[in-house]
Amino acid sequence: MKISSFISTSLPLPASVSGSSSVGEMSGRSVSQQKSDQYANNLAGRTESPQGSSLASRIIERLSSMAHSVIGFIQRMFSEGSHKPVVTPALTPAQMPSPTSFSDSIKQLAAETLPKYMQQLSSLDAETLQKNHDQFATGSGPLRGSITQCQGLMQFCGGELQAEASAILNTPVCGIPFSQWGTVGGAASAYVASGVDLTQAANEIKGLGQQMQQLLSLM
């Protein structure tokens, strides 16, 4: 079939695009090239971190951080099983608590809570120990709580308080140090699960009440 002519069809030019930076010719047709401003915006938005502060400032910041860590540890250790987050306000170097204030706070907390734990353990028997050991040895249970208070006194106080708290923690209960009766999954848990001599274990735990009374008298 003879084709006598060609019909030229002009292609419509694309609508103007905001941000186009150049228009060129390719094979007889107009083309537009869209330019992205993202790279320029990224460059414009970049900020440089300031240079490090002076050595003195960095030392102060580090000391403040250490103080927060110690306070946080104590608050978590003596939180009485609370699940609410503890918010510690910012401290200045002048506000950092002294070792004396730490020990005084720990003694005050022990004086307030140990009698409660002793009261809960005063009626302990074999059946209660076997049934409730996991509960007593976690959170704010009387075994965990009393052991935690003794650990705080041993770590942050000195003299007779430290010695008496250490003696209580190391007192054997059916051959297992009392400190291990405040945890789950260890030797004490295995002993309770065995069901052997639980009456003796309960009596020995109650017997520690006299030593804890002596501990309280030293505060």
Curated annotation (Swiss-Prot):
Single biological process term from Gene Ontology: negative regulation of phagocytosis
Gene Ontology molecular functions: GTPase activator activity
Alphabetically ordered keywords of this record: Cell outer membrane, GTPase activation, Membrane, Plasmid, Virulence
Keyword Membrane: yes
Swiss-Prot/TrEMBL induction comment: At 37 degrees Celsius in the absence of calcium.
Family: Belongs to the YopE family.
Principal localisation: membrane
Intracellular or extracellular location(s): Cell outer membrane
The encoding gene: yopE
Disulfide bonds: none
Residues of the Bacterial Rho-GAP domain: 101-219
Biased composition (Low complexity): 16-32
Keyword RNA-binding recorded: no
Organism: Yersinia enterocolitica
Biased composition (Polar residues): 1-11
Described function: Essential virulence determinant; cytotoxic effector, involved in resistance to phagocytosis.
Miscellaneous comment text of the record: N-terminal is important for export, C-terminal is indispensable for virulence.
Recorded GO CC terms: cell outer membrane
Site positions (Arginine finger): 144
Protein known as: Outer membrane virulence protein YopE
Region Disordered, residue ranges: 1-54
